[in-house]
Regions:
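Small-residue-enriched flexible segments
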Residues: 2-47, 53-59, 65-69, 74, ...
C-alpha cells in the first residue's frame, strides 16, 4: 500500500487542512503526489517544503513533480540524497537507500513566519585553488540582497550545497569572512549514488548543479530554535599530521609519522592497518576520515 493511501485512510483531508504543525512523511517515486492534499497538506499550505529524492530515482522527474507546488507562500526545495529519514515510518527512521522511497519535511509559516531564498554560484569550474574559490564565493555573498533583518535569536540560515562541488568548507569560510550574516547556519549537502554520477538541488522550478541554496528563516512570534548536533562516527586513537594535500580535490598525498618523517599516506595507512596496498580498500570498509575541530 502506498504512503498516499495510508495517509488518506488515517488522516482525513478535512482534518489535514486545519493542521498548522510541522509534518513529515515518505512518498513513492513510482507514484508521485498529484496534489499537496495527497500527502496530507493543505492546498493553501505556506512555509517551506523540503523533499529528499533517493539516489536511484529520476531526479529531474521527481523534482518537477514536487516543484509544481511552488507558490508565493510555499517554497519547495528538492534535494538528491543518499538515503532519507522520516519519523513517520513504523519500522525504522531510515528509508531504503536503494529503493523508490523518498521523504519530505514541511515547515509551516506558523513556525517559520518569513523566509527568503537565494542561490549562490560555487565557482567550481572557474577556480583552481582554495583561496580563489573562497574569494569568488565571498563576492557572490556580498551581492546577496537580503531583505529580512537578521539576528542570532530570531533568524537562521538553511544552506544546502551541491555535494559533488566539494565546496561546503569554502562556502562557510566565505560566509564567516563576509561578516554579513549574524545568524546560525545549518544545513548540509545534496547527496547521490556512490558512483558520484551527480548531485542536484531543485528550487524555483529549476535543477541546479555547482550551486548552493540559502534559505534565511525568521521564527514566528512565540517560537524559538536551538541547534542539534550529532555525529555518525566514533573517533579512533590514530591520527596523522598532514604534509601534502589538495583542499580543492580533497585528497591527501603524504603525512608525517611519529618520528616526524614524511611518508606516503597510502603507506601510512597500510602500516597502521597491517596490510599491503592491494588489501587497503577492503581494510578501510567501515572507516572514514575526519578533521577534529573545536566544540
Amino acid at each position: 500500500m502506498s504512503i498516499i493511501k495510508t495517509i488518506k485512510r488515517h488522516l482525513p483531508v478535512a482534518r489535514l487542512r486545519r493542521s498548522s504543525q510541522p509534518a513529515n512523511g515518505t512518498y513513492d517515486c513510482r507514484a508521485l503526489p498529484d496534489s499537496l492534499a495527497s500527502v496530507g497538506l493543505s492546498s493553501r499550505a505556506g512555509g517551506i517544503l523540503m523533499t529528499f529524492v533517493p539516489p536511484e530515482a529520476d531526479f529531474q522527474r521527481v523534482s518537477q513533480a514536487w516543484q509544481r507546488f511552488n507558490s508565493a507562500d510555499l517554497t519547495v526545495l528538492t534535494l538528491s540524497s543518499n538515503g532519507a529519514l522520516s519519523s513517520s515510518r513504523s519500522q525504522s527512521t531510515y528509508c531504503d537507500g536503494n529503493g523508490p522511497e523518498g521523504s519530505y519535511l514541511w515547515l509551516p509559516d506558523t513556525l517559520i513566519a518569513r523566509h527568503e531564498t537565494h542561490i549562490v554560484d560555487l565557482h567550481v569550474a572557474d577556480t583552481q585553488t582554495a583561496s580563489q574559490r573562497i574569494t569568488a564565493i565571498q563576492q557572490e555573498l556580498a551581492r546577496l540582497q537580503v531583505r529580512m533583518p537578521l539576528s542570532a535569536d530570531r533568524t537562521f540560515a538553511m544552506i544546502y550545497c551541491d555535494g559533488l562541488s566539494a565546496s561546503e568548507g569554502f562556502l562557510m569560510q566565505a560566509w564567516y569572512n563576509s561578516g554579513r550574516f549574524p545568524c546560525l547556519a545549518i544545513g548540509g549537502s545534496a547527496g547521490g549514488k556512490i558512483t558520484f554520477d551527480g548531485t542536484w538541488i531543485g528550487t524555483g522550478g529549476r535543477v541546479l548543479q555547482g550551486k548552493a541554496v540559502i534559505v534565511f528563516c525568521q521564527m514566528a512570534p512565540g517560537k524559538s530554535f536551538a541547534p542539534f548536533k550529532s555525529q555518525n562516527f566514533t573517533p579512533r586513537d590514530q591520527s596523522w599530521l598532514i604534509a601534502e594535500a589538495d583542499p580543492v580535490a580533497r585528497t591527501v598525498t603524504s603525512v608525517f609519522n611519529r618520528q616526524g618523517q614524511q611518508q606516503s599516506f597510502v603507506a601510512a595507512l597500510c602500516e597502521h592497518l597491517n596490510c599491503n596496498e592491494a588489501q587497503l580498500s577492503e581494510r578501510l570498509k567501515g572507516l572514514t576520515f575526519g578533521v577534529k575541530v573545536g566544540e
